[in-house]
Curated annotation (Swiss-Prot):
This is Acetate kinase. Belongs to the acetokinase family. ATP binds at residues 17, 204-208, 279-281, 327-331. Homodimer. It catalyses: acetate + ATP = acetyl phosphate + ADP. It comes from Pseudomonas paraeruginosa (strain DSM 24068 / PA7) (Pseudomonas aeruginosa (strain PA7)). It comes from the Bacteria.
Length: 394
């Protein structure tokens, strides 16, 4: 049987990330980004093989951008497209696995929008546009939260009145599940272990970051919570702060809830600490030039990351290794070294040459000889979404 092609779509409020995934090949035949949708500057950019190109699509919405994309996808797939996988950020407690999309599922995703007001409505825009343009193809939703539905109750419940959970779904959900699942499977493969008999601490580090405790292929704890704001220091998100900060700022500065939410999500994290940038690459360069804010932001980021990994270890029966992934995790030897240095009680130590070598897509072990595994594994959420989609077509 010839190998199958899946189009993977990830829709933001004004963007669409897309990748054509062939089950038999590691490289994407076609991938790209439509951005600034709804504006005069809307543009579609793509790469096919070694070639890059772009097309201005003024005022295009999600449907118009996907319509422009359709002939490119069909051409790159040789006329054989077998399904479409959609990334959906929040599935609440309703979805524990990838799910074939139909009217009932779409309404259930819509019902979870209050849990992810910035993400789920945008995801739905893409789903509805794609289902209109590709009516004859199977469509599958893959949820960021689904992998974490295996968390035990003592890990996902907040110490709040029970009615808030029972009536309003206030609990920890976790995110980046597709990435954590993908890299934990790759880690077991690299280590020669069975997925069902392995335990990992995973750190997905990018503009959004989270840690995860993974035992026998299941998530048992994770750092993000009800929303992606909980947990680690991130690019522009604060991560954990005193829960009373909202009332303190409202009382002393007169800030509204909207102003506080915007500050915590868009003005904090690495950007807030450094007063410079949310980009770790920029901060590392400025740190070398003696910028105190950049140095502080990196120190806080790594210390908080190490604290979270240590906390996640409570869910593990043994430690088979620590995984670094995501844009920062895959490309910052400095962050990996500083984080591991804080975890000396775990007897972790890095091989400096191996750590320096694992950047720009290079995977591998970076631990010193005789010490517990530390692995750098490039994530591939698009391939995992495609595999989940294919599994429902079999």
């Amino acid at each position: 049987m010839p190998s199958r092609n899946i189009l993977v779509i990830n829709c933001g409020s004004s963007s669409i990330k897309f990748a054509l995934v062939n089950e038999a090949h590691s490289l994407f035949p076609l991938h790209g980004l439509a951005e600034r949708l709804g504006s005069r500057d809307a543009v579609l950019r793509w790469k096919r093989g070694g070639d890059s190109d772009s097309l201005m699509i003024p005022n295009a919405d999600h449907r118009a951008a996907l319509a422009q994309l359709l002939p490119m996808v069909q051409n790159a797939a040789g006329g054989k497209l077998h399904g479409i996988g959609h990334r959906v950020v929040h599935g609440g407690e309703l979805f524990t696995h990838a799910t074939r999309l139909d009217g009932r599922v779409i309404e259930a995703i819509r019902a979870t929008a209050p849990l992810a007001p910035l993400h789920n409505p945008a995801n739905l825009q893409g789903i509805e546009a794609a289902m209109t343009l590709f009516p004859g193809l199977p469509h599958v939703a893959v949820f960021d939260t689904a992998f974490h539905q295996s968390l035990p109750e003592h890990a996902y419940r907040y110490a709040l009145p029970e009615a808030l959970y029972r009536e309003h779904g206030v609990r920890r959900y976790g995110f980046h599940g597709t990435s954590h699942r993908y890299v934990s499977h790759r880690a077991a493969e690299m280590a020669g272990l069975a997925v069902g008999d392995s335990s990992w601490l995973s750190a997905h580090l990018g503009n959004g970051s989270s840690t995860c405790a993974i035992v026998n292929g299941q998530s048992l704890d994770t750092s993000m919570g009800l929303t992606p704001l909980e947990g680690l220091v991130m690019g522009t998100r604060s991560g954990d702060v005193d829960p009373n900060l909202h009332s303190h700022l409202a009382r002393t500065l007169g800030w509204s809830l909207e102003r506080i939410d915007s500050m915590l999500n868009n003005e904090s994290g690495l950007l807030g600490l450094s007063n410079l940038s949310n980009d770790m690459r920029t901060l590392e360069q400025e740190r070398e030039q003696g910028h105190p804010g950049a140095a502080l932001a990196i120190e806080v980021f790594c210390y908080r990351l190490a604290k979270s990994l240590a906390a996640m270890s409570c869910a593990l029966p043994q430690l088979d290794g620590v995984i670094f992934t995501g844009g920062i995790g895959e490309n910052s030897p400095l962050v990996r070294a500083k984080t591991v240095a804080h975890l000396r009680l775990f007897d972790l130590r890095l091989d400096q040459e191996a750590n320096a070598r694992c950047v720009r897509g290079v995977a591998g072990p970076i631990q010193a000889t005789g010490h517990p595994r530390v692995l750098v594994i490039p994530t591939n959420e698009e391939r995992q979404i495609a595999l989940d989609t294919l599994a429902l077509l079999d």
